[in-house]
């Protein structure tokens, strides 16, 4: 038992936790802004943001205050009742998007599960039971529930769990003819990330997204945008779909919405919501007052012109620093993404070295992520300072000098 262990170390994980993860060799114990400290007091500059989650950095003072205040009032009452923070948050999300209805949950997977169920239920009720095909894309990622992992286009995550849910097909990302070859009148939805995250930080082409929208209209299929990773300011717009001037029928968000506190949301229209009756779907913890009070504050802070312009400026600064690094090392073939979701594409021959590079960065005090086989992913706090960017890039440079 944990109580008998005098010292908690990385080895404790190997003894206690189901090995679905392979954590770093150090254990963070404290965070503030874009900095983390481990058990030994070593400081790190965090360019991972908890995988695009800590939108306002670690332990933001406003969120800490809101959490303390709400924790003294009400934690949980279940959805037998509604609550004020949930209704205030729903109103803010609706007023800043295409949507008119919101469903709250706890994770991105739950938000997507709700979206996929909603699409099938709506199509069955409005059209017929055969209209249940969902089209997704290879190299996509939509969560770890059995339904969402099957919709995601990566067999390594969905194989060996038995028969998969039927009527799920995959097309090639950014190739419209691949979609045209499988979409038909039995398609209930097309789901896509506007920037494929796990697939390597690959943005969707504007023309591709617009043609997908037209195909969905043609076949009476719903268009679902999975903005779990891109939503709430990550791309310098509140939602990434604003860059494309294309509206979805259903939108899912999570990660940055709670800046580290578990919350997600599925947004849709009154027309689609009209088929839903009490009991069709639900959640125990979704929309709880604690999560919603924090998310409301996050949206208040992020959803301003000045803040979102700041995200774009920070993105340009990071890319400028990366280009300076690349002039010295010739490490990257491409830097892609939008806002503060950045993919650094390594030369193909360096793909086998990516984990060695990550460890070198850790040792130098910089935390980054991977995305696919040869992409380093940066998804820092949206409030990361210029000082932290410059210092982080200096450490990045030093790490590469030592490992290459």
Swiss-Prot record:
Q: Which pathway, per its entry? A: Amino-acid biosynthesis; L-arginine biosynthesis; N(2)-acetyl-L-ornithine from L-glutamate: step 4/4; Amino-acid biosynthesis; L-lysine biosynthesis via DAP pathway; LL-2,6-diaminopimelate from (S)-tetrahydrodipicolinate (succinylase route): step 2/3
Q: Which residues form a coiled coil?
A: none
**CDD domains attached to this UniProt entry:** OAT_like
Query: Where along this sequence does the record place binding of N(2)-acetyl-L-ornithine?
Result: 144, 283
Root EC class: transferase
Matching InterPro entries, A to Z? Answer: AcOrn/SuccOrn_fam (IPR004636), Aminotrans_3 (IPR005814), Aminotrans_3_PPA_site (IPR049704), Class-III_PLP-dep_AT (IPR050103), PyrdxlP-dep_Trfase (IPR015424), PyrdxlP-dep_Trfase_major (IPR015421), PyrdxlP-dep_Trfase_small (IPR015422)
Where it mainly occurs, coarsely classed, is cytoplasm
Q: Name one GO biological process term.
A: L-arginine biosynthetic process
Q: Where in the cell is it found?
A: Cytoplasm
Q: Describe its assembly.
A: Homodimer.
- From what organism does this protein derive? Buchnera aphidicola subsp. Schizaphis graminum (strain Sg)
Q: What does this protein do?
A: Involved in both the arginine and lysine biosynthetic pathways.
Q: Name one Pfam family in it.
A: Aminotran_3
Q: Which residues carry this modification: N6-(pyridoxal phosphate)lysine?
A: 255
Q: Which GO terms describe its cellular component?
A: cytoplasm
Q: Which EC numbers does the record give?
A: 2.6.1.11, 2.6.1.17
GO MF entries: identical protein binding; N2-acetyl-L-ornithine:2-oxoglutarate 5-aminotransferase activity; pyridoxal phosphate binding; succinyldiaminopimelate transaminase activity
How cofactor binds (record note)? Binds 1 pyridoxal phosphate per subunit.
Q: Which cofactor does it need?
A: pyridoxal 5'-phosphate
Q: Tell whether Cytoplasm is among the UniProt keywords.
A: yes
UniProt-annotated binding residues for pyridoxal 5'-phosphate: 108-109, 141, 226-229, 284
Q: Which family does it belong to?
A: Belongs to the class-III pyridoxal-phosphate-dependent aminotransferase family. ArgD subfamily.
**Protein name in UniProt:** Acetylornithine/succinyldiaminopimelate aminotransferase
Could you tell me what reaction this enzyme catalyses? Answer: N(2)-acetyl-L-ornithine + 2-oxoglutarate = N-acetyl-L-glutamate 5-semialdehyde + L-glutamate; N-succinyl-(2S,6S)-2,6-diaminopimelate + 2-oxoglutarate = (S)-2-succinylamino-6-oxoheptanedioate + L-glutamate
């Amino acid at each position: 038992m944990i109580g008998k262990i005098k010292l908690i170390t990385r080895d404790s994980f190997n003894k206690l936790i189901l090995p679905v993860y392979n954590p770093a060799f150090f254990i963070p114990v404290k965070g503030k802004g874009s900095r983390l400290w481990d058990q030994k007091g070593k400081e790190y500059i965090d360019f991972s943001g908890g995988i695009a989650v800590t939108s306002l950095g670690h332990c933001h003072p406003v969120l800490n205050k809101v959490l303390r205040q709400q924790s003294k009032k009400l934690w949980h009452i279940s959805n037998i009742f509604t609550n004020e923070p949930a209704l205030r948050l729903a109103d803010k999300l609706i007023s800043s998007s295409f949507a008119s209805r919101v469903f709250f949950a706890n994770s991105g997977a739950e938000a997507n599960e709700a979206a996929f169920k909603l699409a099938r239920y709506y199509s069955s009720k409005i059209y017929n039971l055969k209209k249940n095909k969902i089209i997704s894309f290879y190299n996509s990622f939509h969560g770890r529930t059995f339904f969402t992992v099957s919709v995601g286009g990566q067999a390594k995550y969905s194989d060996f769990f038995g028969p998969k849910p039927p009527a799920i097909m995959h097309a090639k990302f950014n190739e419209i003819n691949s979609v045209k070859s499988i979409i038909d009148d039995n398609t209930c939805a097309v789901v896509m990330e506007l920037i494929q995250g796990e697939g390597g930080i690959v943005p969707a082409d504007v023309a591709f997204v617009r043609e997908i929208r037209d195909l969905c209209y043609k076949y009476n299929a719903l268009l679902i945008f999975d903005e779990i990773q891109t939503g709430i300011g990550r791309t310098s717009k509140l939602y990434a779909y604003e860059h494309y001037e294309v509206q979805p029928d259903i939108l899912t968000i999570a990660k940055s919405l709670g800046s580290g506190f578990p919350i997600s949301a599925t947004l849709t229209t009154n027309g689609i919501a009209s088929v839903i009756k009490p009991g069709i779907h639900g959640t125990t913890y979704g929309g709880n007052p604690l999560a919603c009070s924090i998310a409301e504050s996050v949206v208040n802070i992020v959803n301003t012109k000045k803040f979102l312009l700041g995200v774009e400026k920070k993105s340009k600064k990071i890319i400028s620093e990366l280009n300076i690094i690349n002039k010295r090392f010739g490490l990257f073939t491409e830097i892609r993404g939008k806002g503060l979701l950045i993919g650094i594409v390594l030369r193909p021959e360096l793909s086998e070295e990516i984990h060695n590079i990550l460890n070198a960065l850790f040792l130098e005090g910089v935390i980054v992520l991977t995305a696919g086989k040869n992409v380093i992913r940066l998804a820092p706090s949206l409030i990361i300072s210029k000082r932290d960017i410059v210092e982080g890039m200096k450490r990045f440079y030093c790490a590469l000098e030592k490992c290459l």
